[in-house]
Structures are given as structure tokens and as C-alpha cells.
Amino acid sequence: LVEQTVARYGRIDVLVNNAGISMRAMFKDLELDVMRALMDTNYWGTVYCTKYALPWLLESKGSVVGVISTAGFVGLPARTGYSASKFAIRGFLNTLRIEHINDGLHVLVFAPGFTASNIRSAALTFDGTPQGDSPREEGKMMSAEKVAGILARAIDRRTRQKVLTFVAKLYLWLDVRFPKVSDRLAYKYMAREPDSPLK
């Protein structure tokens, strides 16, 4: 991927790590191969792409972006593998930013919240089979195009971290100040999903 990009364009200015798999299952029921698949795609995919693009990004003083989720800040029940992978991406990129603080590398951790996309229909169940239809109302979510526009502006401004939705910002604020309240609200919020594994 990196070689093809450089061969065609001669440089890399921005790497957006956006590939991801989600899940819906309680950890007690989850087959560990599902967790491994999530980490391989979400976390290791980010690590490998960043590793091989990094020399070019350092040369261009470019941007590395990790698209995470509210689940990368606050543990979401029935999303243990997904949350773990997004926490790992955030930790990796925050550390990378500090390592290259004097090199001109821009690192952005981007948390869009629920976005209208097919990630939920492809989400894995406890045994790794896709769940099928999304349990959420996609029409009420931010469009992928709107999210992409906000992301492009954050890259232009060389923003360090961007969290989009009010609900996500509220959870982050509560998690720091009132963590027990945050835990309870996260549980209730996820339990309201149709066919939630928490019921």
C-alpha cells in the first residue's frame, strides 16, 4: 500500500487509519478468536500502516490519524474487544506523538461517535459471525461525508484530539469527574439497544 502510494504520488502527506471491525457480545460468552480478529484489524492494522508510512510522513511533516470511538475513552459493555482495540490505538498514537514532538509530525486521535456506515451490520457476534442488520437507527446518525469534512478540517488545523458528539464529550467529562455515574450511564445506554446482549 505504502509502496504503491509513493510510486504513484512520490510522497505521503496524510495517513488515516480508519479500518475497523466492531462486535456485540458479552466477554464471558466471547470466543477469543473474535477478540484477536478485532485487535488484528483495528490495532495491528493501525500499527503496521503507521510503521511503513512513517518515514514518508516524517519527511513531509505530515499527519497520522487514528479513527477511534467513544469506546476508546470509556469502556462500552458488550464491546470489550472493540473498546480494547480503540484504547490501544489511542495509547499507541499518543505515545507516537510524544516520540516525534520535535520532528514536525502531526498525530490526531479522532473520535466521531456513531456514524452512518456499515460497520454495525458487519459487527461480529460472540462466535465471529456477522450480526447482520444494525440495531441502531442509521438515519439519525451523522453522515460519513459530514464526518470526513470535520476530519479534513482537523487535519488542516493539526488538531491533537477531536471528539465529535455531545454524548461522547459528556461521557468523557463524567468519566473523569464521576466515574461511577459514567459506568452506570454507559451500561444503561448500551442496554437500550434492540436485542442488546446486556438484557
Located regions from the model:
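Residue(s) in the substrate-gating loop at a strand-loop-helix junction
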Residues: 69
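Active-site helix of classical SDR
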Residues: 50, 85
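Active-site-adjacent segment of SDR/Rossmann-fold oxidoreductases
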Residues: 10, 74, 95-106
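Active-site loop immediately N-terminal to the catalytic Tyr-X3-Lys motif
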Residues: 27-28, 74-81
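Conserved amphipathic alpha-helix within the SDR
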Residues: 1-10
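Substrate-binding pocket helix/loop in short-chain dehydrogenase/reductase
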Residues: 26-27, 31-36
